Each structure stands twice: as C-alpha cells, then as structure tokens.
C-alpha cells in the first residue's frame, strides 16, 4: 500500500465513510412513484389520504430496501420525509392477523416518539394496524395493561421506558422483526448508547435494523458496526435536503442584553403566523418567558424540566394555533412539526452546528417557504460564518420589510 493510500484510508474513518462524517451510498435504485413500490392497497390509500403525492428523495431510495428486509443506514436531514420512510416500510411488513409487537422504533424525545406514532397511525388508517407510544412521564400501570391486553403491532418509544418494559417482560421481543433508530446521532451521542445496546441484546439476532440520522459522526458508524449486517447505505445529499425555500437572516444585536428589546420589536411580525424561538438553556427559556409576560407579550414555553402532561397541553395549544409563539430548547427542536410555523428565531445560535438544520428545518418542510432569523452578538459572528460554511448557505442581514417575506 502506498503512503498516500494509507493516509487516505485513515482519514476516512470507518468503512463506508467519506471525510467529514458523510456516508457513501451503495444503493442506487430509485422508485419515483408510490404505486411502483408494490405496497398494499390499504397502505396506499393511507399514503394518499395523508397528502403525499410523490415520494421524497429519501422515500424513493430507502423504502424498497427496507421492505426487502435489508439492514439500512439512511442519512437525511429533518424535513425530508424520513419518518414516513420507515413508517411505510413497517406497515408494509407487519402481519395484521398476528396480535403481537412486530416493529420497535426508538426516538430521542417523547415529543418525537408521539409524532412518529401519529404518522404511523395516519398512514395505517385503512389497515387497522395498532401503534403505541411507550414513553417516560406517563403512567406505568396503564402502559403495562395496554401492552399485556393489546400487544400493539408497532411500538414507538424512548429508550428508557422501552428498555424497562422489555426488561420486565411486559413487552415481548419474540415477534419483533424490525428495529428502527430514528435521529440516531442524537440517541447515540451521550446517554442512550448503552440503553440501545441493552435493548438490542434482548431482540432476536435476525432482527432487521434501520438507522436514520441527519449526521453521521464516526461514533454512530462504529455503533452501527456492532449491530448491523452488511447494511445498505443511502445518503440524501445536502443539496437535495432542505435549507432550500428557507430565507435565512441575522440581526446584529452586538450585545446579549440587547436581544430582549430586539425580540419585543419583532413581536408583531412573529404573530403574523406562528413562530418558534430557540434558546440554549432551560433556565433562560423560563427567564425570557417571564420577561415577555412582564411586558404583556403572549408567549408559551416548553422544555425538558416540565412534566409530560404540561408539555402535551402546550404542544396541543400550539398545534391548534391558539398559542402563536413558542419558546423552547434544542431538546425539542426534533419534535416540533407544526405545518403553520413559517418563522424560526434563534435567540441563541445553537452550540452544536448540526442542530441548526433541526431548528430551522421546521419552517420549510417539503419545500414550504419559511424564514429564519438569527440574533448575533459580536462573539457569535464566527459561529454564524461557521454555520454558513458547514451548510454551504448564505445568511444575510435582515431587511426592514421582513414581515412581507413571511
């Protein structure tokens, strides 16, 4: 091996990696119509009733290998239709007559798990498939009863509660044939890696594994090596993904303490539709909410310290449009899927640039238009440039007529 080859293989990290944590596709088949995927009639009805007309880039590539039973690693960002990719694959594969759990989906947050459950139920509406969200913060006894009485076809959950139910044998792995890890980068970084591995040990060795992730840091790929067999790798490249359709601006606020006044000046603009404001810490979410209320601005807030009931009520009000401005943290960036949101404000720039797309990818899902406004202090300028470079995008200074763009 020559020296240049040697250094190249080192730079590339694990097999199937290109530099910069991007996987290399090894599957080129594209099916550009749902009708050509050999899906059941009742599932197709659900897909069209849900409002899908043509499969998105990830759906055109990943549904088929998933249905064929391959292990699949799919790299695609938020807003590309990846939830429906695995939901359709699961619904096509389950045996409706078998009253047993046959597919298990893990997600990093409760909100995301509930959202996935809603998508599965909607797509499977004409099939009579059952799907249950197995998440922390809910009544354990009621959950145990549901699992024992009904044995839902599909379980979507967070790692802690799912492991607990498997461990206590209320959830049986016997018929689980498909295991999906959604937002795998988020789950495998910190905390959940061990729990996922423990869950995996309880599943049958021939269980199909599907892993979806916006980013592919090397530790994610290392973990996939432990529990995936010759996976199909599918990359939906950044340019097919979606900062497209989202106008990105920054406001030069110079100093942190000037952000609040700037936000209040923007408030009238925010309430034209619905807006999400992202902040980096839970404490600061509470602080900003208090400050806004003290100035008689109506805002609602949500973060991980709140109990599940409270979070559900807040999300319900926001989804229905009765609350118009939601202040939240990155934890929930991946669980807010509200069609009407066309404005996202980064009160704080994300500490982790990968989260930028999760935050603003909300606004312009499937090519819907959206506006993102970043508040930038002197210290933030380098981070902003870094984000521009990372996503190969341009973020301009906010024009005075921003209200006309929303």
Swiss-Prot record:
The modification Phosphothreonine is found at residue 158. One of its GO terms (molecular function) is ATP hydrolysis activity. A motif (Q motif) lies at residues 32-60. Pfam families: DEAD, Helicase_C. InterPro entries: DEAD/DEAH_box_helicase_dom, EIF4A_DEADc, Helicase_ATP-bd, Helicase_C-like, P-loop_NTPase, RNA-helicase_DEAD-box_CS, RNA_helicase_DEAD_Q_motif. Keywords: Acetylation, ATP-binding, Cell membrane, Cytoplasm, Helicase, Host-virus interaction, Hydrolase, Initiation factor, Isopeptide bond, Membrane, Nucleotide-binding, Phosphoprotein, Protein biosynthesis, RNA-binding, Ubl conjugation. Residues 1-21 are annotated as: Disordered. A motif (DEAD box) lies at residues 182-185. GO terms for cellular component: cytoplasm; cytoplasmic stress granule; cytosol; eukaryotic translation initiation factor 4F complex; extracellular exosome; membrane; nuclear stress granule; perinuclear region of cytoplasm. It comes from the Eukaryota. CDD domains: DEADc_EIF4AII_EIF4AI_DDX2 (cd18046), SF2_C_DEAD (cd18787). GO terms for biological process: cytoplasmic translational initiation; positive regulation of transcription by RNA polymerase II; translational initiation. It is found in: Cytoplasm, Perinuclear region; Cell membrane; Cytoplasm, Stress granule. ATP binds at residues 76-83. Residues 63-234 form the Helicase ATP-binding domain. PROSITE patterns: DEAD_ATP_HELICASE, HELICASE_ATP_BIND_1, HELICASE_CTER, Q_MOTIF. eIF4F is a multi-subunit complex, the composition of which varies with external and internal environmental conditions. It is composed of at least EIF4A, EIF4E and EIF4G1/EIF4G3. Interacts with PAIP1, EIF4E and UPF2. Found in a complex with XPO7, EIF4A1, ARHGAP1, VPS26A, VPS29, VPS35 and SFN. May interact with NOM1. Interacts with PDCD4; this interferes with the interaction between EIF4A and EIF4G. Interacts with RBM4. Interacts with DDX3X in an RNA-independent manner. (Microbial infection) Interacts with human cytomegalovirus/HHV-5 protein UL69. ATP-dependent RNA helicase which is a subunit of the eIF4F complex involved in cap recognition and is required for mRNA binding to ribosome. In the current model of translation initiation, eIF4A unwinds RNA secondary structures in the 5'-UTR of mRNAs which is necessary to allow efficient binding of the small ribosomal subunit, and subsequent scanning for the initiator codon. As a result, promotes cell proliferation and growth. Belongs to the DEAD box helicase family. eIF4A subfamily. This is Eukaryotic initiation factor 4A-I.
């Amino acid at each position: 091996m020559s020296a240049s080859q040697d250094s190249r293989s080192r730079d590339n990290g694990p097999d199937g990696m290109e530099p910069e944590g991007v996987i290399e596709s090894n599957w080129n088949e594209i099916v550009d119509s749902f009708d050509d995927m050999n899906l059941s009639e009742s599932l197709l009805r659900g897909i069209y009733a849900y409002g899908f007309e043509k499969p998105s880039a990830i759906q055109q590539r990943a549904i088929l290998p998933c249905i064929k039973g391959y292990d699949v690693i799919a790299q695609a960002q938020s807003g590309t239709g990846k939830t429906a990719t695995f939901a359709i694959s699961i619904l096509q594969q389950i045996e409706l007559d078998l009253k047993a759990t046959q597919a298990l989906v893990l997600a990093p947050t409760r909100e995301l798990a509930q959202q996935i459950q809603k998508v599965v139920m909607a797509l499977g509406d004409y099939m009579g498939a059952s799907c249950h969200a197995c998440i922390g913060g809910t009544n354990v006894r009621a959950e145990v009863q549901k699992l024992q009485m009904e044995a839902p076809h599909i379980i979507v959950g967070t790692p802690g509660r799912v492991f607990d139910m498997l461990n206590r044998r209320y959830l049986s792995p016997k018929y689980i044939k498909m295991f999906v890890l959604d937002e795998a980068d988020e789950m495998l970084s910190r905390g959940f890696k061990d729990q996922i591995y423990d869950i995996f040990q309880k599943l049958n060795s021939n269980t199909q594994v599907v892993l979806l992730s916006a980013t592919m840091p090397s530790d994610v790929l290392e973990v996939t090596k432990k529990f995936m067999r010759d996976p199909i790798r599918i990359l939906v490249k950044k340019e097919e993904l979606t900062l497209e359709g989202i106008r990105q601006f920054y406001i030069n606020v110079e100093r942190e303490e000037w952000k609040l006044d700037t936000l209040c000046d923007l408030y009238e603009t925010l309430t034209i539709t619905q807006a999400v404001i992202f902040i980096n810490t839970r404490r600061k979410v509470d602080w900003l909410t208090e400050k806004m209320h003290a100035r008689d601005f109506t805002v609602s807030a949500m973060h991980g310290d709140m109990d599940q009931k409270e979070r559900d009520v807040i999300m319900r009000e926001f989804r229905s449009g009765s609350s118009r401005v939601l202040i939240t943290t990155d934890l929930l960036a991946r669980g807010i899927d509200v069609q009407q949101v066309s404005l996202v404000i980064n009160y704080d720039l994300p500490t982790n640039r990968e989260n930028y797309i999760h935050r603003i990818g909300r606004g312009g899902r499937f090519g819907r238009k959206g506006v993102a406004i970043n508040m930038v202090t002197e210290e933030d300028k380098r981070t902003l440039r870094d984000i521009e470079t990372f996503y190969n995008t341009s973020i301009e200074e906010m024009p005075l007529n921003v209200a006309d763009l929303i």
